[in-house]
């Protein structure tokens, strides 16, 4: 397959990959659907700055004019931020049609993993992954992110699954598909806005070097698939569990009442939760992304050292 037929790798990113330097992939749904302009652009550029500050090259991933992009320019990030929700969220099923039509697409965890892997990027920082939605035993609403983690060899650094989901069933699904769930400095799965969920992770790992080694060995053994690193939100930005859980329950009920389902569910719930918490949930969301970018960069640095030895 000729990847350059579909894929544009930003020169700085291509040079870093060719030289075995650390690179961290970033998604673009957080820009288009995560928050309003200009806050979305400022946040995206700040995440890139944090990755550089911690020794890696950032590669924000998106689809622009039917081209898969691994690494965006500031102008492209600005374009994405201004268009916002007018850009379609793109999952695995959407890639071929968007490329065939020459359209734009905002990459989710799934599509960011796919394009990162095509480009040769091993580490990806995001806010939280999708998972098994509440009530999925009747709706079958399960995020494609989980299937991608099972099949695509990229390490995903996140703050746990979004707490709007059924976390127990999400962990069961990942276990069935052989995806290791690692807690960074914790034995408990973080729940995005809060540091605790009541569910155990598979392993606790306490350093970026050990994270890198575990992922390197997994690849070396030919096991395939990704690895999920869950990094708790910093204590000072963690939300009160009662407050956030009440907001989540209200938002879930409202989504049901309005008949919202499928890929519209998560943006609706996050926007509703933001309203119900007076914007506190968005502030927490931004800080946990910064925190994950820092850990992903440090881990990518260690991974590049292992690859060179």
Language-model segments: residues:
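N- or domain-start disorder-to-order transition segments that initiate the globular core
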Residues: 1-20
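Glycine-rich nucleotide/cofactor/substrate-binding loop typically near the N-terminus or early
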Residues: 28, 33-35, 41-98, 220-236, ...
